[in-house]
């Protein structure tokens, strides 16, 4: 089964103090009109697909109510009308509550999923590369990147999604050197286009399949296998 990275963010100041690999995280929040606004992250409600500049967050309200798009930044499992927010010390991610608030693999995505999930703009794409964002000279997985959840591995260092070397040919070597089962090292998973590193807090929420533990704390999970790149990054269907 394929899933997509929809969004990635962290609001933990402790993570910013970590110098390891100079981890730079995408800071995105789907906020209500009454949520906090600041000079660097203004929230604009858009009913159309518009580009934003700098780090402004755009809320797309088509087929969604603002009140249902709240992100509750708590270190616990919390729910709003349409979303379940899973938080850890370092990362927060969201899945549609209809896709299972209990976070089990078999019920994560099914026919009851919301068919229109709208996402925020992160930053301008790196050059004309459709697969990555360039944020402070670091490449990040594109919103909407598809990966196989069964090949997703985890560790306990806190979210750091950056490109290893972008070379599919080197994947096996990179993977064989980093695959562990003890949560102590950075592990890799294979996306549909390239190799990305994901490190995840040990306090994350997990789901299980065939006695294997997988974490949902690093990514927004979508039930959809296709998206419209012309509308990207605002909409995933």
Swiss-Prot record:
Region (Disordered) residue ranges read 29-80
- Species of provenance: Dictyostelium discoideum
Compositional bias segments (type: Low complexity): 30-80
Top-rank taxon: Eukaryota
Q: What is this protein called?
A: Putative uncharacterized protein DDB_G0268338
